[in-house]
Amino acid sequence: MNAILDTQYEQWRRHGYLWLPGHLNASETSSLMRWIEELAAWPEAPGKWMKWYEQARGRRQLCRVEDFLPYHAAFAEFLNAGAIAEILERLCGERATLFKEKVNFKLAGGAGFEPHQDAPAFTTFGQRYHITLMVSIDPATRENGCLEVADGHHGTGLLPQANDGTLDRAWVDRQLWRPIEMQPGDLLFFDSYVPHRSGANRSDRPRRALYVTYNRASDGDYRGEYFAKKRAAFPPECERVAGKDYSAAASLYNLGNPIT
């Protein structure tokens, strides 16, 4: 894996996102696929990694796994490796610190994610700016719900929102959304102000993707505190108290996604 070119940095500066096709080699891509299959096979475990589910095609199916780095050393080493750190430092303007990690599985029939910006959900600790690294594990196409971005708005700040924290529908309907169709091993970096969404998976195969969010090191290291607060306010199913209402935290911790 190599660092980025000056022309690629200019693309980042103009658009707020940077797509690097084929950036991982075959060995790295194969390792990621294997590790994600391991995560999927892990049982639900209160107090440890978080597994999230959705209702799709009349059944409960895996939607997301997060907070897994303390339990998977190889994954942790990869995501803090020099090559990724070097790219992030160039994009951030300083050293980056890992803030949160997740895998969205979007299995066959899985629902899409509503249009939103990440920034409102990422500023809990007074941080000013985040970058998310997306790694495509499976081919991401229009049919299976690839990521789509609305270009030209990352420098605008927070955009008009609906009551649930997703983007205002009238604003969404006026935008031209660009689908980013990716292959396994492609990387996509995007900042927390880029409007994005994805459609449902209408294929018979998964569209798995790794998402890792980083913040500038000068804004502090809050990964552990973030997941502790999320677990307390919006825990996974296996930790929930029967009859308790967790909806108040949904706009912060369940923004625009199909998790039940």
Each model region followed by its residue ranges:
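Non-heme Fe(II)-dependent double-stranded beta-helix
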Residues: 1-15, 21-115, 121-124
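Double-stranded beta-helix
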Residues: 10, 140-199, 219
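Non-heme Fe(II)/2-oxoglutarate
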Residues: 33, 39-42, 46-50, 194, ...
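Active-site region of the double-stranded beta-helix
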Residues: 94, 120-127, 136-146, 153-154
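Generic beta-strand structural signal
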Residues: 94-101, 111-113, 129-135, 145, ...
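Active-site glycine-rich loop that binds ribose-phosphate moieties when present
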Residues: 113-121, 135, 167-174
